[in-house]
């Protein structure tokens, strides 16, 4: 911020010294002549311009903070949108699970649902609201059908319906809960509105404090720059400058440095211009060389990246040409030959096994029958056990989900309570700060009215007491004391009139003593004082009162400053606490998003596994049912037709031979499957290698992009510096051309400087809009001056904004500018 502020001031006051330098030069000026109104107006206008640009800069800082706040709000809305999208997907998954559960409970044939229409994903968060309503209407009949089916199931399975009294009791209970929730919601809405008001007030206070801090920072930076400038100019003496009323030798406050630059410009101007052109040519050639070297560096960097990627992830051709690959290929061929020999031995063993199987048919039949019986028994036991396990798992999952839900609710309640406590503490601290501010303002008011008694009352009782009631109590106490003393005097003296006169005499005596003491303190013990001494005493008495009032104001100002320091410190602590709260909330939001993403991924994986297991289970069930039906048919055929046993045995033998052929085919398919799996593994390895190479290339690309961005920023900074230097060079060239033209016309350096100063003063006197007429009128709001024609033209065209600062003005805000 200090660099930006420095740039603003340098652009505003390019030729004039700083305000501290002006004050120093004004204080060191030896001539008693006052500066002219024109110079004072110009300096005042420059100072006003600096203040205006500083105010614009502070407003820009405020806009930047507002922009950051709006960006944060946009990010929060985006996070809410993602949460809603996840909710949409959760609704889709829940709908799918409900349909599957109803289908399993009621049966797909009895339910008569079209799964293509029911399970079609109609809810999409990207679709507009009317289309979502249409999708919900399309699912409404299906939902009603599901609910009707559930009601039918409950009606068939229920023992007896609930009584009317129970229903009425439940209805009353639900209505009471609804009314309680409604009142609670209204209470929460009122609390939310109050919290919103306090939040807006806190935001306004924070905005005002930020503006005050920006102003203080800018003032601190300005004071630091002035201190540095005073240190740099502290050793310079100005005894030989001509004083013109402002302490400078020239009207705009410049010294004779420019004249020294142009003192020898006559004979050496051609050489300076030639050196400048040679330097420009040298800079252009260096720029071309730099661009060529940068292009070569880029090419070499790209070549290095390519070679690095090839070194980390070589190609297949290079791998095949390597000797290690040849050695591994030889080992692989040896292993393949060994596997083929083992396969031949396995085939021979299989043929022998088939022969033994054919010869041992009867034994196999008996064993198979016994195994079938045991299998059926074990299958029934396993089915019963699976149903028990599924029931227990369901109960366990329900209990776990309920426990997790309750834990999450308890954690949320604890967090909410802690946040409410933090807000209450911050509100209490804010109330204490406001109390301190009220006490400070009351003290300031008392100091402004020179009320010492009210200040002492504030120090003793604070802001909660009533000063008027305290004074009334003191008056009543004094009156009681006076009455007591009067009654005492009346008791002592029998004469009431004499006692009363004595009381009056004593009162007058005490007042005369106090007045005499005041006069003796001012005039001394001599009662014969002259008129001038009396006048002096009166003046001294006035000064004494002023001194007491100023001391009172100084004391109150110190107390107010200390209170302000404590308030600023407390507000800074509150701001730090709020900043930490915001950071913790951001981190919690990020952790929550990561957790939601991870849970969604795990849920998708679990769903895929579940559906795969269900499909496998259905396939196994279908196969088991088909096998059971075939076994029953075969048993019935065996019981009914024993006479065809021989033919059946022959058929069994034929079937066994076919089974052997199928087994051989299955072995061939297994070999093919192994080959395909090996190819798949090889392709996966290639894909992984390609992905690793791609990841490394992307990392290199990101690194190069970051380097390019850094180089671009550095280049932009250098370009800004070069633009600034070009402006300086252009200005120097213009001065060189002007000096050369002046030397050709035979004009002396002093005359040329006077001409330049005259042109500059004429430019200051002329209107900045048309640059033709002189400044005649001033806008009192911003104190910018223009000619009468330009302002009248703007008033006539209703463009009533200042051309310099854009501030709106009226016709009454224009005053005539008088030059004296």
Curated annotation (Swiss-Prot):
Residues 68-92, 164-226, 287-738 form a coiled coil. E3 ubiquitin-protein ligase that mediates monoubiquitination of histone H2B to form H2BK123ub1. H2BK123ub1 gives a specific tag for epigenetic transcriptional activation and is also a prerequisite for H3K4me and H3K79me formation. This is E3 ubiquitin-protein ligase BRE1. It catalyses: S-ubiquitinyl-[E2 ubiquitin-conjugating enzyme]-L-cysteine + [acceptor protein]-L-lysine = [E2 ubiquitin-conjugating enzyme]-L-cysteine + N(6)-ubiquitinyl-[acceptor protein]-L-lysine. Residues 235-252 have a biased composition (Polar residues). Its main location: nucleus. Belongs to the BRE1 family. Its EC number is 2.3.2.27. GO terms for molecular function: ubiquitin protein ligase activity; zinc ion binding. GO terms for biological process: chromatin organization; protein ubiquitination. Keywords: Chromatin regulator, Coiled coil, Metal-binding, Nucleus, Transferase, Ubl conjugation pathway, Zinc, Zinc-finger. Pathway: Protein modification; protein ubiquitination. The gene is BRE1. It comes from Cryptococcus neoformans var. neoformans serotype D (strain B-3501A) (Filobasidiella neoformans).
